[in-house]
């Protein structure tokens, strides 16, 4: 007989979660039913993964089978990254419970007219301006790049930051200047958050519209909608403080992460991402796919889902 005091682990909606936690140097495990980080002295720190959108695991972390199972049950995305979040090596997938969302995304991506409509809607939302008529996806991509470079230049001027161009090398992280390091750290935070939302909603990170051919193409598409009004100003702000000697003694990347976390919370970004994705895909002008006529319900009816549509719980 089931324990009446036992509460099944079920995902909660992305919009009700905190954003991102970076972890390093410790073992992640489940002890006494709690998700914990255990350091080399055996000190445990509890981490409420059920209330997080994403865990970023840096070098020096190990994770047990029980910890991964718990993250999967509560729908917390786990991403393995390089030191300071500079590389993405792998990601656990907490979503995948819905095929209709993925098929609708793929239908829009495969139809050239619908794809162009989606890209135009992204452009409109990103710059609050209608894109010129009769422009291809490649032309819009080029126009977008010009506008983004100008935004970077203006923000650098606003915050009095020395700025040459967006340059960084994954193999020589410390060789980059402080503004570029801050920007890379900030965008890594945004990418993790957007991927968690995409998976939670039942979409595929790899099926992009403006970006193509990358495992995170749609992540880049979605992140670009918010980048210049969220993490980019935050990165330049931190770079300016460091240049003026007003930052703390922690690495620039840590200062940026803390500032981005606070910015995500204040802006309510997690509440916006999934509804915005739905509206953008509807701009393609296609109808969502219907169930196949031969489709049948499972013999054992599934439990009423919790969380977002893509969560398995």
Curated annotation (Swiss-Prot):
The keyword Magnesium applies. Transmembrane segments: none annotated. It holds the Pfam family Cas_Cas1. One of its GO terms (biological process) is defense response to virus. Its cofactor is Mg(2+); Mn(2+). Residues 288-313 are annotated as: Disordered. One of its GO terms (molecular function) is metal ion binding. It is an enzyme of class 3 (hydrolase). Mn(2+) binds at residues 144, 211, 224. Its EC number is 3.1.-.-. Keywords: Antiviral defense, DNA-binding, Endonuclease, Hydrolase, Magnesium, Manganese, Metal-binding, Nuclease. Homodimer, forms a heterotetramer with a Cas2 homodimer. Belongs to the CRISPR-associated endonuclease Cas1 family. CRISPR (clustered regularly interspaced short palindromic repeat), is an adaptive immune system that provides protection against mobile genetic elements (viruses, transposable elements and conjugative plasmids). CRISPR clusters contain spacers, sequences complementary to antecedent mobile elements, and target invading nucleic acids. CRISPR clusters are transcribed and processed into CRISPR RNA (crRNA). Acts as a dsDNA endonuclease. Involved in the integration of spacer DNA into the CRISPR cassette. HAMAP family: Cas1 (MF_01470). This is CRISPR-associated endonuclease Cas1 1. It comes from Rhodospirillum rubrum (strain ATCC 11170 / ATH 1.1.1 / DSM 467 / LMG 4362 / NCIMB 8255 / S1). The gene is cas1-1.
């Amino acid at each position: 007989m089931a324990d009446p005091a036992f509460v099944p682990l079920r995902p909660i909606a992305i919009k009700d979660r905190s954003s991102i936690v970076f972890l390093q140097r410790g073992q992640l495990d489940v002890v006494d039913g709690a998700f914990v980080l255990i350091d080399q002295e055996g000190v445990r720190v509890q981490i409420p993964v059920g209330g997080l959108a994403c865990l970023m695991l840096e070098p020096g972390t190990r994770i047990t089978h029980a910890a991964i199972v718990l993250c999967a049950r509560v729908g917390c995305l786990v991403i393995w990254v390089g030191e300071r979040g500079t590389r993405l090596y792998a990601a656990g997938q907490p979503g995948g419970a819905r095929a209709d969302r993925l098929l609708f995304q793929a239908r829009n991506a495969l139809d050239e007219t619908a794809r162009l409509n989606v890209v135009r809607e992204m452009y409109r939302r990103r710059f609050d301006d209608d894109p010129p008529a009769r422009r291809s996806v490649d032309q819009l991509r080029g126009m977008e790049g010009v506008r983004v470079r100008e935004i970077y230049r203006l923000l650098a001027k606003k915050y009095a930051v020395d700025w040459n161009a967006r340059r960084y090398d994954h193999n020589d992280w410390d060789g980059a200047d402080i503004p570029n390091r801050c920007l890379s750290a900030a965008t890594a935070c945004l990418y993790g958050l957007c991927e968690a939302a995409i998976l939670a909603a039942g979409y595929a990170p790899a099926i992009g519209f403006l970006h193509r051919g990358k495992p995170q193409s749609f992540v880049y598409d979605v992140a670009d909608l918010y980048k210049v009004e969220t993490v980019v100003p935050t990165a330049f702000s931190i770079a300016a403080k460091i240049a003026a000697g007003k930052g703390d003694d922690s690495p620039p990347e840590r200062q940026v992460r803390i500032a981005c976390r606070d910015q995500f919370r204040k802006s309510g970004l997690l509440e916006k991402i999934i509804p915005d994705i739905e509206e953008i895909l509807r701009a393609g002008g296609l109808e969502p796919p219907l169930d196949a006529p031969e489709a049948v319900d499972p013999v054992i009816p599934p439990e009423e889902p919790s969380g977002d549509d893509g969560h398995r719980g």
